[in-house]
Amino acid sequence: MTPPAEPPLGGYLVVDLSSGIAGGYCTKLLADGGAEVVKVEPPHGDPLRSWSASGAAIPPDGDGALFSFLACSKQSVLADPDRPGDLDFVRELLDAADAVVWSPGAGLAAHPALAPAEIYRTLPHLTVTSITPFGLEGPWRDRAATEFTLQAWSGGIIGLGRGSPNRPPVFVGGQVGEWVAGAYAAAATMTARFAGLGTGRGELIDLSILEAQILCLTYFPVTFFDTAGRPWRTTRALSVPGVATAKDGLVAVGCGTAQQWSDFCAMTGHPEWVEEASTLSITAQANLVAREIEAWMGSRTVAEIRALATAFRVPNALVGNGANLPFMDHFEARGSFVRNPRDGFTQPGHPYRLRPARLRPFRPAPRLGEHTEKYRALSRPPRPAIERPSTSDRLPFTGLRILDMTAFWAGPSCTHFLSMLGAEVIHLESTSRPDGTRLLAGLPVTEDRWWERSGIFSGLNTNKKSLTLDLRHGRGRELLRALIPTCDVLVENYTPRVLDQIGLDYEGVRTLRPDAIMLRMPGFGLDGPWRENAAFAYVIEDASGLTWLTGHPDRNPLEPYSIGDPNAGVHALNALLLALEHRRRTGEGVLVEAAMVDAALNVAAEQVIEYSAYGALLEAAGNRGPGAAPQNLYPTAGLDEFGRSDCWVAIAVATDEQWAALRGAIGDPEWAASPRLSTAAGRREQQTFIDEHLAAWCEPRTADQVVELLWAAGVPVGKVMQPHRQAELPQLRFRGFFEEVEHPVNGRVRHSTLPIRLSHGPDRFHVSPAPLLGEHNRELLTGLGLSDSQIAALAAEGVIGTAPYSSR
């Protein structure tokens, strides 16, 4: 088939009034999809033009490599906020545009006429996407924050109990919250476009980076707490094996399920390590024999360990970093890395692949103001004025039917976004293999209806329907083939061989519905040497470099144990929205390949870029980071809720002005008055000295006292929250981020929503609880023409059911 003339977003004009990674990545994804992105910059340019995470010198006539990556395929125009004529120019651009992406750090963001609400008030045709730390409204809207302090507030620094109980908690390195917020912003922008088709109406999208972090760095801790009556974990614990030292380097091996732990023990020749009657978690059991596991791993090469683990179906990976990633055999075979079209360094390719729809090939990033005269000379008619439409109950994806053949976190998080905004999502399971998150209830299987009591499953699957079909049974496969033509989209995250073996690859699906969109979410892609490798979040983190930047410098890196899954989900969502737009324009179906590892390589892009461009290998640095000095966690007075002296605050000084504010807030002590501390470079050289004094100042004060003093002065600070306490934050209460959902088994339970608030609603995201297993069998099978007697026969044969096979 001849490729389409243009990518899905061709003709879609986006004005970029943002700065930083989140806005830059949002508009990069839109540009990759074909949008015309015009970046409006002040005379000194976007700060990222002079940024290098390693501190590499950027020549005056050049740009930082990260900027060159994020700005691929964009246009740059200059506008000075102090010149009225330039503001008129920006207004003309906005008049002609379809969307604008805004963040508070941009050069023109402070001008009242260019505030998000004001832009939307005067130009209601526009989709206005605002990206801020806490949201546009609420008690914390103007509070100072950085990626690091937001991770403290989100609970992401604690995560699932990451790290050693004998060390401070440790944040996830690499600015991951900004990258994920950018991906959510791109998806929200395309969602508003989807909703506005035919009406001409715009949308004000209010995105909170804090809320994006909650969804991607923590595992529905509030919902789990409400259903299980306890936190997921009360102490930090190292993943064992996790990232281990082999005879010739680092290797990652993980056990995310009881079966994998059993297989790992068999692989090592120690089946006695499995204690089936034990009440301890897998992590706790593994930690009991950590020294023995360490010795076993250390006596073998990386290749030997990986070959054994793969044979035993135990998840495993090489440990990626900026130096080695482009040369791994799998990524070489798939062409996962390309050359930057302007500066020649190595960068990741697109985070997903579409066929026959296409993404825009990377074009050179613009020089500062390169396209100013072009856009000043253009005469684009402004959009015709529209009446602000009355509020409608119709949600963006009303009328869209999704067959959700995914499990665990990555796939369901993608389809959950759709179900919360109106799509009919049919979650397909079987009684022999229910969704794996149903097993994460934190309860013994002797408990009544244990499979309905998982807060994790509930957190990912509200508003969905449940259908059970045993695909090992011929009748189950027949019914699946009957269901597919009724669905617009099929989403699956099996290893590739599973659907291929039953004739339901994309070509097979097309024979059933020619315009179907098939979204495939394999861990490592549809081809390449690792095609069939088991993929869980932590393995994706290891293989992509996300793990490499997390942990203490004197220890092996620590797996974030979180972001690999939801990051894959939000990138798959972006790809699906592009596919829907392609189908709207052409009538064609689309195969979408959204490999989890490709999404991870993109949010970890800075490592490969820095190494390729500057020869700098970024590494884990504990709780320090390249964007602030000082930046660290400091112990505070008091006991935590578990009776331990384990209370911490996160402090990050990102500017010289914030350093002056910090000095004033702590009484301008003599030690802080040294001229060598007045610059970021000087403070970076003296971080240990500063840390010692800040720790002494924080130690006699409670975390709340430290936060009150420093925030009032404008210093980024955060209390390190236990994740299950997220709902106590005043800002989240103000924004209604958590909603109570009545569940037939679990009762009234708090659920997180989406990290966006939309001017056209909905006022409430959760309209029905997560489905019971097979709850909608009768409804959906009747819709396929089956009679009650036929449905009863299917239940008798075990093709369908409402309880796991092992519980019957």
Predicted regions and their residues:
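N-terminal helix-loop segment corresponding to the beta1-alpha1 unit
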Residues: 1-198, 225, 303, 341, ...
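Aromatic-enriched alpha-helical interface/lid elements that frame and gate functional surfaces
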Residues: 239-312, 316, 630-713, 717
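Glycine-rich beta-alpha junction loops
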Residues: 44, 133-135, 209-214, 248-250, ...
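Conserved Rossmann-fold dehydrogenase catalytic segment
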Residues: 136, 166-175, 197-213, 230-236, ...
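Oxidoreductase and adenylate-handling cofactor-binding alpha/beta cores
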Residues: 154, 182-203, 219-225, 265-272, ...
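Terminal low-complexity tails and localization/encapsulation signals of metabolic enzymes
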Residues: 1-13, 245, 321-404, 619, ...
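Flexible glycine/proline-enriched surface loops and loop-helix/loop-strand junctions
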Residues: 111, 167-177, 245-249, 357-360, ...
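Short, well-structured beta-strand/strand-turn elements
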Residues: 36-37, 310-325, 425-428, 711-725, ...
